[in-house]
Swiss-Prot record:
InterPro entries: D-isomer_DH_CS, D-isomer_DH_NAD-bd, GhrA_Enterobacterales, NAD(P)-bd_dom_sf. It comes from Citrobacter koseri (strain ATCC BAA-895 / CDC 4225-83 / SGSC4696). GO terms for molecular function: glyoxylate reductase (NADPH) activity; hydroxypyruvate reductase (NADH) activity; hydroxypyruvate reductase (NADPH) activity; NAD binding. Belongs to the D-isomer specific 2-hydroxyacid dehydrogenase family. GhrA subfamily. HAMAP family: 2_Hacid_dh_C_GhrA. This is Glyoxylate/hydroxypyruvate reductase A. One of its GO terms (cellular component) is cytoplasm. NCBIfam families: PRK15469.1.
Amino acid sequence: MEIMFYHPTFDTAWWLNALAKAIPGANIREWKPGDNEPADYALVWHPPVEMLEGRKLKAVFALGAGVDSILSKLKAHPEMLDASIPLFRLEDTGMGLQMQEYAVSQVLHWFRRFDDYQALKNQSTWQPLPEYDRDEFTVGIMGAGVLGAKVAEALQAWGFPLRCWSRSRKSWPGVESFAGAEELGAFLNQTRVLINLLPNTAETVGIINSGLLNQLRDGAYLLNLARGVHVNEDDLLAALNSEKLKGAMLDVFSREPLPKESPLWQHPRVAMTPHIAAVTRPAEAVDYISRTITHLERGESVTGQVDRVRGY
C-alpha cells in the first residue's frame, strides 16, 4: 500500500513515523514536486493540483474537519481529482471536545454576566446585577453535524433550552429541531445565544447578516466557531452598535489574520481568538485515518466521506 502525505505546516517527520506505526506494511512518503510515483491514498492539506491530478487513488483524506479549501480548488481545477475518488474529512479527532469546551465556557460567561462585570470593573464600579433566567436563555446551534451534536450534548448538562437548525431535521434528545429555510425565522426568534457551526458552502456564505440578526431576540449573543465568511462583518457591527446584539465571540474571520484596521479589534463588546477553537489533534487524526483505511481495504462501510455537491 502506497500513501502520500502533504501538509505545508505540520511536522511531516512525526506524521510519517506515526502513520507507519499505525498502518503496518504501508509505504508512507512525503509528496514533493516531481513525485509521479503511484499511490493508493493521499493525505493532504492545501495540496498543489499536480499532486492529485491524473492519479488513480482509492481515497483522499483532508487533514482537517473543514474541506472548503480543497473543494474550492476542485471547483477551479476539476481535473485535479476524478469525481469517482472519495474524499474524506477528519471526523472529530479531538475537535469535538475542544468545541464543547469553547462553547460551554462562553455560554456560561454570558449567562453569568461576566462580560458586564468586566465592564463594571473597568469603571471601578462595584454593582451586583440581576441574574438571567435560565429558562429564557435559549441557545440555538446553526449546523447540526458532528461538532454541532457534540456542543448540544455538552450544553444539556447546564439546563438551557436548546434548539438546532440544519438542512434536515434532527432527533436529538432534549433539543428542538428546525429544518430548512422556511423554519429559520422560527428558530431565530427565541434564540438568545446563536452558535454558528455551519459548513462553508455557497448557500451559507454571508448567511449571518442584518436580515438574520434582526430576527434574534433583543440583546442576543453571537458565537462564531465555523467560518468567517458566514458573517457580514459590517452588519455584525451595526447590530452591536444598535444593541440588537449584546456581544459577540469570534474565532474566525473573513480575512485571517484579521487586519489591524478592522473595527472589530477595538469594539468593547467583541471578544476574539485567532482561529483556535478546535485544531487537529495529530494522534487522534492518525487513529481515525488508519482505522478508516483499514475498513476501506476490507470493503467495509466507513463514515466521514464528503458530499462534494453539498460541500460537507
